[in-house]
Amino acid sequence: MSKVSKAYREAAAKVDRDNKYTPLQAAKLAKATSSKNYDATIDVAIRLGVDPRKADQLVRGTVALPNGTGKDVRVVVFAEGPNATAAEEAGADFVGSAELIEKIQGGWTDFDAAIATPDQMAKVGRVARVLGPRGLMPNPKTGTVTTDVAKAVSEIKGGKISFRVDKASNLHALIGKASFDEKKLAENYGALIDELLRIKPSSSKGKYIKKVTLSSTNGPGVPVDETIQKNYADDAEA
């Protein structure tokens, strides 16, 4: 445990907490302060100026990261007949209907995303209490309730991520791996910010993007200049 603490302290010492870095600089620092023992995930935490208790300020959506996530995403598809065949051909990891529902009711949640055809949603509703809290419940707003299951599978496998603000007005998302080039991480970060700006609730007053932090798995947080909202991969000084 002391080795972990020492490694963390050494990593944290590289980050100036009083500075706000450009997205490119932050990505470079997040990589530099990541574990050398494995390919760490790079995540972004964003504090939004919204009140999630108000339905019209519950920010949620999806975005296709231009450089993917670097993660092998396990996808479940609730479908039958030709739709099930299409899902399998598109590369879905698990495809089925009632048998998958029963498996989930038994405690199985070994997957990262779930897609369903509209006719399956009555059945999927039986496991809403399991899938919902984990962010796995199919939803038309995120494109995961659809008749075009092949497209949905391909998008998720290709780097499409879902995001949702929590009760404390924070939003967390994966933007890549430490093995990514920092410009690719900055581009992925920019795609997320652009989408958040696009769907900003009209009822949200004051500053919308209030605070941004990048970090690797178990690494220190790197403050990002939240006012930078274009040219995310530019190599400019903060």
UniProtKB/Swiss-Prot annotation:
Function: Binds directly to 23S rRNA. The L1 stalk is quite mobile in the ribosome, and is involved in E site tRNA release.
CC per GO annotation: large ribosomal subunit
InterPro entries in UniProt: Ribosom_uL1_bac-type, Ribosomal_uL1, Ribosomal_uL1-like, Ribosomal_uL1/biogenesis, Ribosomal_uL1_3-a/b-sand, Ribosomal_uL1_CS
Family: Belongs to the universal ribosomal protein uL1 family.
Xref: PROSITE patterns: RIBOSOMAL_L1
Name of the protein in question: Large ribosomal subunit protein uL1
Organism for this UniProt entry: Corynebacterium urealyticum (strain ATCC 43042 / DSM 7109)
Gene name, Swiss-Prot/TrEMBL: rplA
Molecular function terms, GO-annotated: rRNA binding; structural constituent of ribosome; tRNA binding
Subunit-structure text: Part of the 50S ribosomal subunit.
HAMAP family: Ribosomal_uL1_B
One record GO biological process: regulation of translation
Keyword Lipoprotein belongs to the record: no
Keywords linked to the UniProt accession: Repressor, Ribonucleoprotein, Ribosomal protein, RNA-binding, rRNA-binding, Translation regulation, tRNA-binding
Domain of life: Bacteria
Residue span of region Disordered: 217-238
